[in-house]
Amino acid sequence: MYDDLVEFLQESVTPFHAAATAESWLCAAGFTRLEEADYWNLEPGKGYYTTRNGSSVVAWRVPQHAIGGWRIVASHSDSPSWKIKADTVENDGCRRLSVEGYGGMIMSTWLDRPLTVGGRALVKTEDGIESRLVYLDRDLLVIPSLAIHFQRDINKGHTYNPQVDMQPLWGPAGSRTLTDLVAESLGVEAADILDSDLQLVTRQAPTQIGPDGEFFMAPRIDDLECAATTLLGFLDASGETDSACAPVWAMFDNEEVGSSSRMGAASSYLRDVLDRILEAVPHSAQASHRAMANSFMLSADNAHATHPNFPQKSDPCAPVRLGGGVVLKYNASQKYTTNAVSGAIFRAICQKADVPVQVFTNRADEAGGSTLGNLQSHTLPIPMADIGCAQFAMHSAVETASVADAEAMTKAVAAFYRVHLRALGDGTYTLE
């Protein structure tokens, strides 16, 4: 399992690459790609997927019988990074890229490390326009720190100005431009690149640490760890799922900036797909409402582990540790969707599968973050639980997590898809 996770992390250098990696796994498992603009003819027992913007994916398998509910797991494909605004600019004998921040990253962690560029380019062809993945697979850039001799108090704290401190060094004056290198990598003329969505990419490869390799470090663990492990669980359970419910796996873009895009969790994307699935299979007039009432969803986004150097930042009543199992997240202000009902259901599933579960709550004096589950509730009024894998250094250029937790997440999600869950009434369920 860990090797699969490493593959996903290495290949998914941007949201566009994450979607392409997921697509390759789905295709290898026999799933068929559908375009949103096409007519959908679905066959019982078959698996399908669709993409939006090349950065969000929804996959599902049609059950052999009428759809009586949905089993959904959702994660996100994006991570904090630096979006490239313009090609290289020259000043003081150097070429630099012009970038702006995407999401709430720890800025200092991007300094003094090898970086490169990835994303997509829109290329002019004989027939029109084509989207191509871009990844310049070599150490290419750096954001250099200012020497301590010019800022003697740097170790007492520094407020980073992204316009001043975080612009990456490209090369000497007169060097080839970014557009030149992208065109060369794609085998096209620079003039044929009509536009692009490009960002900086951390070059560090995933690596295991600890006396026995218990932990691993990698860029983009939030949230590609959940994206990869939930997809592994989805594929592992394929063909063994609840015969009355359709298993669905989703990965959305733009969670780190609010999810409000057409490919984000706050859009109608997932609801659109579910509605179209029902339209393509025989169903009654009330099928959609009945299916929603008998559905359940997991929002999978990583969680904060209790930091050994800063234990006071965590709720002492709910310590979270690396290797402690899948994290179930609660928040009184509904930033997380878990309540007593959905929490009990998830705990029961994990107990049956022998998967450890730990609880995350914020300190009462900390607002904390949110994720995609509560936003998805706007369009999908079904019971949900927020889960994740524990990690350190969330939104750093390189983060740290547990190998055992990744295995636990995969196992828990596979068990979730396999379980026969029935809503007997509001708050009453059977599990088989």
Please give the residue ranges for each predicted region.
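N-terminal hydrophobic/helix-forming segments and targeting peptides
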Residues: 1-432
